[in-house]
Amino acid sequence: MGARASVLTGGKLDQWEKIYLRPGGKKKYMMKHLVWASRELERFACNPGLMDTAEGCAQLLRQLEPALKTGSEGLRSLFNTLAVLYCVHNNIKVQNTQEALEKLREKMKAEQKEPEPEQAAGAAAAPESSISRNYPLVQNAQGQMVHQPLSPRTLNAWVKVVEEKAFNPEVIPMFMALSEGATPQDLNTMLNTVGGHQAAMQMLKEVINEEAAEWDRGHPVHMGPIPPGQVREPRGSDIAGTTSTLAEQVAWMTANPPVPVGDIYRRWIVLGLNKIVRMYSPASILDIKQGPKETFRDYVDRFYKTLRAEQATQEVKNWMTETLLVQNANPDCKNILRALGPGASLEEMMTACQGVGGPAHKARVLAEAMTQAQTATSVFMQRGNFKGIRKTIKCFNCGKEGHLARNCKAPRKKGCWKCGQEGHQMKDCRSGERQANFLGKVWPLSKGRPGNFPQTTTRKEPTAPPIESYGYQEEKTTQGTEREEKEKTESSLYPPLTSLKSLFGSDPSLQ
């Protein structure tokens, strides 16, 4: 089948490309919408080849219509696309999708109300009548409607869906696609093939019994004999396939007027499946929020998946989409969505938020944050709030303050910065000028040892007469005695070092 690019050709393709997606919009239908619709039909296990004719589009529309109440946004878009394609096949002039939907509703109502005189002509006119000839009810060579059982391939597809999806919301559209035109016996066969999930099957049986009882209350049995050539009226249990045979089911579905027992039973099953989906999907739409690192596309997928399971009217679901989709997004996407405005489409939202959460977006946010931090720091320092330790720097080249020698603009001084001679640096300078050592004392000393060595001086005795004692003289005498003993001890511990004379000059202890 390929991409189904040959669905429309010539004038029909030109008519297709003139139809707007929405009233008052600028975008029109293109070839890519047909390709997308064909892929979606394959995903729902439908035949994309039905898109080539108006009858096939009508069959697909009847198949998808019951699932619109609980369907996602993608399912509604698929239905709208098929409605426009149906109008193009029938040469119905429409300007946008809304007009196509209105034309489709009018045509369906007209088909339901118009009489079918060809059905009364008998089996000879059966091929030209409006009797359903959908699978599994097919017409044999004699013109009679016979039943053809469901293929094992269809049953296998249904069982595989239930095992993989476990009654997720997408199970309902798949059931509608696989059970198109099926009889109650075929539907019971599909339900009986589900091996697990017996609790869900029991819930489904309870819903079917309730709907059957409601049918019996609304359709009482007419008293009296049944006219010749007619079949009895079906009861609720007959529609469920428990008290009716396959021949009776086929007769009801092909009678004039027909009683679509298969479609009625299918609606009951869909109601039960909706109840099961709510049980298997306990998350509320209010709890679906976008994570800080989650992409907007994944968030939208989770949102619509949960929205499909919500049992609410379409108006309420539209309100949830317009309000909660933006409200529960993360701050980055929320700012972008609010800037788009309330009338933005889902395509515009996903395009605008496409890069949010990726490496490029994270790098851009980090760069903006660093720029703001640097701006705040510079403003903070300019206002005088930065109180650091300010040191006055001095240039060794020119001797001025305020800059370093490597930034000095004056001519470079050659040689030692202290004496001006070449051949050595200032740290190795041996000029006669005295300089302070690392202890802060002037070095070298004029005489004697350096200040970091203990030095002893000759104590001179006073020549004045002794001072009279006034009570505190004894304390001073005691302190003086202790000082003398300490000096004697130091002299015994540190004898004079005469060997240092060659390094430090004359020894003051020998003078």
From Swiss-Prot:
Which terms under GO biological process does the entry name? viral budding via host ESCRT complex; viral translational frameshifting
* GO CC, one annotated term: host cell nucleus
Q: Does the keyword Zinc apply?
A: yes
Concerning PROSITE patterns, the annotation shows:
ZF_CCHC
Keywords attached to this Swiss-Prot or TrEMBL record, sorted alphabetically, are: Capsid protein, Host cell membrane, Host cytoplasm, Host membrane, Host nucleus, Host-virus interaction, Lipoprotein, Membrane, Metal-binding, Myristate, Phosphoprotein, Repeat, RNA-binding, Viral budding, Viral budding via the host ESCRT complexes, Viral nucleoprotein, Viral release from host cell, Virion, Zinc, Zinc-finger
Disordered: annotated segments: 107-129, 443-511
**Motif LYPX(n)L motif: positions:** 493-503
* Residues covalently joined to lipid (N-myristoyl glycine): G2
Which cysteines are disulphide-bonded? none
Q: Where is this motif: PTAP/PSAP motif?
A: 462-465
Q: Bias regions of kind Low complexity — which residues?
A: 118-128
A GO term for molecular function: structural molecule activity
Bias category Basic and acidic residues: which stretches?
A: 107-116, 473-490
Q: How is it modified after translation?
A: Capsid protein p24 is phosphorylated.
Q: Where is this site: Cleavage?
A: Y135, P136, L366, A367, F380, M381, N437, F438, F453, P454
Q: Which SUPFAM superfamilies match?
A: Retroviral matrix proteins, Retrovirus capsid dimerization domain-like, Retrovirus capsid protein, N-terminal core domain, Retrovirus zinc finger-like domains
Instruction: Name the Pfam families for this protein.
Output: Gag_p17, Gag_p24, Gag_p24_C, Gag_p6, zf-CCHC
Zinc finger annotations (CCHC-type) as residue ranges: 393-410, 414-431
Residue ranges annotated as motif Nuclear export signal: 16-22
Q: Protein biosynthesis: present as a keyword of the record?
A: no
Q: Which SMART domains match?
A: ZnF_C2HC
Per the record, what about its domains?
Late-budding domains (L domains) are short sequence motifs essential for viral particle budding. They recruit proteins of the host ESCRT machinery (Endosomal Sorting Complex Required for Transport) or ESCRT-associated proteins. p6-gag contains one L domain: a PTAP/PSAP motif, which interacts with the UEV domain of TSG101.
Q: What exactly does this protein do?
A: Matrix protein p17 targets Gag and Gag-Pol polyproteins to the plasma membrane via a multipartite membrane binding signal, that includes its myristoylated N-terminus. Also mediates nuclear localization of the preintegration complex. Implicated in the release from host cell mediated by Vpu. Capsid protein p24 forms the conical core of the virus that encapsulates the genomic RNA-nucleocapsid complex.
Q: Which family does it belong to?
A: Belongs to the primate lentivirus group gag polyprotein family.
- Name the record gives this protein: Gag polyprotein
Q: Gene encoding this polypeptide?
A: gag
